[in-house]
């Protein structure tokens, strides 16, 4: 069997600093995502004083705030948490699409990993399921993805 070098991220958050962007819109969902992300990072060695939660109005504001945080040089990773729930107008498509594209651009342009924890659901029930019930907690998943990516990038 051939031996191939494999680079993997360790799930050790000790010594790392994270910014968590959390929207106020749909905060009854987002607060569960934030709780999951904070708990995950703490369980993996991140000190609570090394986490900063930044509350913003909604998902559309995520990219500009993520950009400012990334440019600050103070954070190893950024976790973007929010919930956009489809309504009767096309507003959902514009907000969800632009927030998603913006966050991806920030990560690529800055080199700072941005965890995508923006729920885009068709109903409140689906959002609740993804905020800690049947479908897990997407805040935890976004935090885990950022932590692993930070540790992988340290090795590249």
Swiss-Prot record:
Q: Which UniProt keywords apply?
A: Riboflavin biosynthesis, Transferase
Q: Which residues form a coiled coil?
A: none
Share an example GO biological-process annotation for this protein: riboflavin biosynthetic process
A GO molecular function assigned to this protein is:
6,7-dimethyl-8-ribityllumazine synthase activity
* Keyword check for Acyltransferase: no
Task: Tell me which EC number(s) this protein carries.
Answer: 2.5.1.78
Function of this protein? Catalyzes the formation of 6,7-dimethyl-8-ribityllumazine by condensation of 5-amino-6-(D-ribitylamino)uracil with 3,4-dihydroxy-2-butanone 4-phosphate. This is the penultimate step in the biosynthesis of riboflavin.
NCBIfam families per the record?
lumazine-synth, PRK00061.1-4
* Name of the protein this chain belongs to: 6,7-dimethyl-8-ribityllumazine synthase
């Amino acid at each position: 069997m051939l031996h191939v070098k494999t680079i993997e991220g360790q799930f050790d958050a000790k010594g790392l600093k994270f910014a968590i962007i959390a929207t106020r819109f749909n905060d009854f969902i987002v607060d569960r995502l934030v709780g999951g992300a904070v708990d995950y990072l703490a369980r993996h060695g991140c000190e609570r004083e090394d986490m900063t939660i930044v509350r913003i109005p909604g998902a559309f504001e995520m990219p500009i705030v993520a950009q400012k945080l990334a440019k600050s040089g103070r954070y190893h990773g950024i976790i973007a948490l929010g919930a956009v729930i489809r309504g009767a107008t096309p507003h959902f498509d514009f907000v969800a699409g632009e927030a998603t594209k913006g966050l991806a651009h920030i990560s690529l342009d800055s080199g700072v990993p941005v965890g995508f924890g923006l729920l885009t659901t068709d109903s409140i029930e689906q959002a609740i399921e993804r905020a800690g019930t049947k479908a897990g907690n997407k805040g935890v998943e976004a935090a885990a993805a950022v932590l692993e990516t930070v540790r992988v990038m340290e090795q590249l």
